[in-house]
């Protein structure tokens, strides 16, 4: 047989080259001998097996080559019918595998007729054809098995690729959902923080406004108290001036001109009347002053209490009205005192004018 080489890959990075060894049959009277040329192979790299079901001998082997390549062969030979199966034996020498198949009956070729020789040749030819057919069938099955393996491997790779793709898509979807949840949570936190900051700022502004209003009320009350104290001081100064002027008028003697000369004699009647008049006005002013003093003291105490309430934000609308009423009452009392003082001064001026004119007349 002619040797041929064929490269096949398994997809795992190793390539196989199919090797077809040369074989030769020899028919001897005692046995049938099969010689197979296996140059390059060692005894440990080959295997010979007898298949009882098909009465065939299978010879297989493989050896490594360079660059991750392997050389292999798988040959099948038919065992002749006139053969003792249990006595088949082989030997490997000089790269040649020799398989000896002893015959059941020893034939003498020298005494065989020509027809027997022809029949033996025909049988040998038929055996070789059968051997060739079986070899081709074995190779075809081997090729189909290899293709099935390749198909199975391809399907497995496609399945793994699909699983990987689905896993990557699921992972990407999960990461997208996680990012979305994180962004939503961050937006909620920022909104809550912004709302809290706005509430704090609004509260601070409200507190500042209330504090400013309280300061304005305190300043207003202080201004009112200062104004009332200034008015009271002014009225007291005016009263002291009026009283000092009246005392001078009372103590000044009236000059009376007579024929013997002028003599300064007091007028008890008019003086007593004037004194009584001054005494009535003084009592009115004194009474008003006492009432005003009591009112001022009460107002000061009340003002202090109200100031404390204003600081504590406890002042009521009724207390505000009471404060206004106290201020109005004080103004009325001040006005009444001023009016009484003015009236008294006017009456004193009018009464002093006739007396002076009468005292200035001289007797003839």
From Swiss-Prot:
Keyword Transcription: no
Segments for region (Disordered): 345-364
Domain of life: Eukaryota
Membrane topology value: Single-pass membrane protein
Membrane-spanning parts: 322-342
Region (3 X 14 AA repeats B of [IMA]-[RK]-K-L-Q-E-E-A-K-A-K-E-[EK]-[LA]): 163-206
PANTHER family: HEAT SHOCK PROTEIN 26, PROTEIN RESTRICTED TEV MOVEMENT 2
All residue ranges annotated as the sHSP domain in the record: 14-121
Region (6 X 5 AA repeats A of L-E-E-[SKR]-[ERK]), start-end ranges: 129-220
GO biological process: defense response
Keyword Transmembrane recorded: yes
InterPro entries assigned: A-crystallin/Hsp20_dom (IPR002068), HSP20-like_chaperone (IPR008978)
Protein name per Swiss-Prot or TrEMBL: Inactive protein RESTRICTED TEV MOVEMENT 2
């Amino acid at each position: 047989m002619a040797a041929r080489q064929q490269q096949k890959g398994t997809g795992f990075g190793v390539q196989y080259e199919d090797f077809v060894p040369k074989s030769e049959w020899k028919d001897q009277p005692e046995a049938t001998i099969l010689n197979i040329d296996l140059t390059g192979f060692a005894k440990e790299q080959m295997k010979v097996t007898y298949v009882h079901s098909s009465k065939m001998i299978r010879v297989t082997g493989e050896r490594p080559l360079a660059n991750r390549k392997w050389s292999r062969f798988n040959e099948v030979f038919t065992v002749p019918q006139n053969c003792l199966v249990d006595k088949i034996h082989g030997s490997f020498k000089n790269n040649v595998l020799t398989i000896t198949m002893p015959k059941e009956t020893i034939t003498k070729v020298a005494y065989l007729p020509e027809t027997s020789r022809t029949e033996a040749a025909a049988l040998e030819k038929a055996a070789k054809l059968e051997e060739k057919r079986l070899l081709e069938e074995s190779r075809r099955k081997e090729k189909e098995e290899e293709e099935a393996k390749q198909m199975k491997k391809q399907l497995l790779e496609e399945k793994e690729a699909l699983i990987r793709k689905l896993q990557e898509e699921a992972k990407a979807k999960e990461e997208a959902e996680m990012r979305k949840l994180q962004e939503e949570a961050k937006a909620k936190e920022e909104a809550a923080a912004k709302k809290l900051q706005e509430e704090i700022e609004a509260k601070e502004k409200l507190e500042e406004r209330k504090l400013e209003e309280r300061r304005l009320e305190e300043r207003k009350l202080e201004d009112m108290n200062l104004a009332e104290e200034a008015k009271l001081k002014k009225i007291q100064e005016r009263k002291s001036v009026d009283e000092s002027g009246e005392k001078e008028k009372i103590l000044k003697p009236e000059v009376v001109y007579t024929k013997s000369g002028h003599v300064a004699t007091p007028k008890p009647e008019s003086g007593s009347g004037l004194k009584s008049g001054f005494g009535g006005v003084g009592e009115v002013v004194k009474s008003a002053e006492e009432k005003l003093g009591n009112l001022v003291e009460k107002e000061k105490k009340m003002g202090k209490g109200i100031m404390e309430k204003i600081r504590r934000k406890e002042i009521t609308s009724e207390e505000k009205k009471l404060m206004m009423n106290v201020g109005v009452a004080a103004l009325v009392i001040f006005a009444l005192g001023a009016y009484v003082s003015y009236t008294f001064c006017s009456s004193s001026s009018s009464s002093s004018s006739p007396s002076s004119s009468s005292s200035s007349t001289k007797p003839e």
